[in-house]
């Protein structure tokens, strides 16, 4: 499968599939119509298990298009419900690792209100937006790079 090169499967069973999403691939279809993770994984499941018709795949969390990382998809509606509940109850924690060209402070918390421009599919700071909290801690510093 040609698009299978866009993902690496870390874990798979009858209930979930855990993959690495590469940078610059949308999680779901957007205005660009570029191939997205949901479609890629559905095609993979359909081909691997010789499934006729539509394949169920539950999207329980997202990563922004520019971001790469580990994603968990539900293969059943029951798994989707349970994963969504765990996320809602904060039993699942998201962690991001970033590499920056600039040195960062040792520890900082940034709080902003973000709104989304649907036409450009971008977010911006706005008084009427949804609260967004970013907390980071610098873990190392190597030459010109810093890893918060």
Regions found by a protein language model. Give the residues of each.
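RNA pseudouridine synthases
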Residues: 1-148
